[in-house]
Amino acid sequence: MIVADSECRAELKDYLRFAPGGVGDSGPGEEQRESRARRGPRGPSAFIPVEEVLREGAESLEQHLGLEALMSSGRVDNLAVVMGLHPDYFTSFWRLHYLLLHTDGPLASSWRHYIAIMAAARHQCSYLVGSHMAEFLQTGGDPEWLLGLHRAPEKLRKLSEINKLLAHRPWLITKEHIQALLKTGEHTWSLAELIQALVLLTHCHSLSSFVFGCGILPEGDADGSPAPQAPTPPSEQSSPPSRDPLNNSGGFESARDVEALMERMQQLQESLLRDEGTSQEEMESRFELEKSESLLVTPSADILEPSPHPDMLCFVEDPTFGYEDFTRRGAQAPPTFRAQDYTWEDHGYSLIQRLYPEGGQLLDEKFQAAYSLTYNTIAMHSGVDTSVLRRAIWNYIHCVFGIRYDDYDYGEVNQLLERNLKVYIKTVACYPEKTTRRMYNLFWRHFRHSEKVHVNLLLLEARMQAALLYALRAITRYMT
């Protein structure tokens, strides 16, 4: 994914020279610049102006190559450059990513990449599927397996059911699913193998959310020629290219929205300091209201379902199975997952530490890196305490997956998260393949792109933690 030798440094400079004031050679000539302009922006993201993401992201990566030099022999990819807008988080992310896919472990390297293919294919994430297909072959994988699941070993095919549930409805996972994989037989999984596989599946599901949420594009050829662009939904084909939100035409209204958001944040922080308590019954009622209202938070009806690509369908069983709202009208909903009954800190982390000790600490660090990441800024304002906003985003993501915190007032979610942001969050977390540039542009119109990437880091980690909590709870019940 990223390399720290001279080849990598040259590649980073290739990225940087296309940003204003870039390093390296004097940059592309006038003819080359005009050619690039005719082709349109050709950066790592379809949503973020090339100058911003390449300048900040690539420079951040270059400054952090000392750590990566010890661990990798890949290439700098577009995902890494965009995530590099937040280098402190990227360090934690990369440590776990490298552990899961490149160090010794219960599963063979080629198997891990095949599991990653299975996970990414559930969301039709061609970016990750293609990347892991290449690495699968590089690590000695059998090319026959790439013809589809039917060519893979039975042991891998047995992961399909839990892969499907983790990707779309993790609350349906039970101890019986765990038992079916661990029961004695010819194609049985060991507990150590299964834990690594489950962490890898949730890692790649949530990484698919990040890829779609940030509009990550395939890498271009080495000579700088453009790679195929991400498909654009028909409803957006006439949309103009993404603009810097700090200069958008609705600047006055957007600036007023920022001021109003900051006022609400300040009021909430003051009420917390005054300890204006809310009864437990009222807290529960507000959660149920938020969960019910999330039914109405859906993408626009004119957004067409993306057509599954045959190259990915071959890795997917039951392709029509997808996310369904945790609480559906007229349906018997599963019981709410009370976070206090099975927390990451007290239950999930300790189980992972026992069964996959090298991964538990890195997982915890990655969750904390995303949750606590702050620059104390909002749009054009600095010195801002953003903790209540970050908590509202994290808890709303868990809410759409049916997880409730008894000590959290879900009234804060409605006060802090505008509808466009809710639509974006739910789409990226639950059915990321439906994410569009228009959704990205509509929320937080006066915020920096790096702040929108920050939202995607919260999405990635909150989604992964939610799915892991359901899976680890099922394992705990199986073991007791």
From Swiss-Prot:
InterPro entries: AhpD-like, Sestrin. It comes from the Eukaryota. GO terms for biological process: cellular oxidant detoxification; cellular response to amino acid starvation; cellular response to amino acid stimulus; cellular response to glucose starvation; cellular response to L-leucine; cellular response to leucine starvation; cellular response to oxidative stress; D-glucose import. It is found in: Cytoplasm. Changing residue 444 to L: Decreased affinity for leucine. Requires increased leucine concentration to dissociate from GATOR2 and activate TORC1 signaling. The keyword Ubl conjugation applies. Widely expressed. Residues 308-480 are annotated as: C-terminal domain. This is Sestrin-2. It comes from Homo sapiens (Human). The gene is SESN2.
